[in-house]
Structures are given as C-alpha cells and as structure tokens.
C-alpha cells in the first residue's frame, strides 16, 4: 500500500471559505487531489482550465506531485487588473488635488 499524506484543499469566496481535509497517496498530482477532494462538486464554478492553483500561496501547475502534507489553494480569477485600478485611483487623486 502506498504511503499517504494528509492535505487540505481550500477555496475561498468573498463571504465564506471551504476547507476539505483528506488523505491521498504520496506522489499524487495537485489535480488528482483536487478531484478526489470533492470540492468541484461543491463549487461547480471552479474550472481547472481557468482557475489557478497554488501551495501555500505559491502558484503551481496541476501536474505538480505532492510528496508531503500541504495546503492546496484554488484561486478565483481577478475581477479587475490591479495596475488599471491603481492608475484610476492616481488619476482620481490628481483631479481632486486640482480642485
């Protein structure tokens, strides 16, 4: 029997977070772990072709192999480009300072 590791799969929405804990075989991929966790059934809006994933805040590929206990995070797409938001904020501040 292959060694198993305990992992968490996490997906956060603005008002709530889902955290699932499970044991998987050492060497399983991030994608295998996500699918096995059942989180895709709970959150059908997750599309692994679109949503990025990471381990403790560091982006990784779905094919990344898991060798030790970890936390898999599924990220939501950004609603706005951070650079564009900063540009708009700076422009607004500039206009207000001219008044």
UniProtKB/Swiss-Prot annotation:
Q: Which SUPFAM superfamilies match?
A: MoaD/ThiS (SSF54285)
Q: Which domain of life is it from?
A: Bacteria
Q: Which Gene3D superfamilies match?
A: RnfH-like
Similarity section:
Belongs to the UPF0125 (RnfH) family.
Q: What is this protein called?
A: Protein RnfH
Q: What is the lineage of its organism?
A: Bacteria, Pseudomonadati, Pseudomonadota, Gammaproteobacteria, Aeromonadales
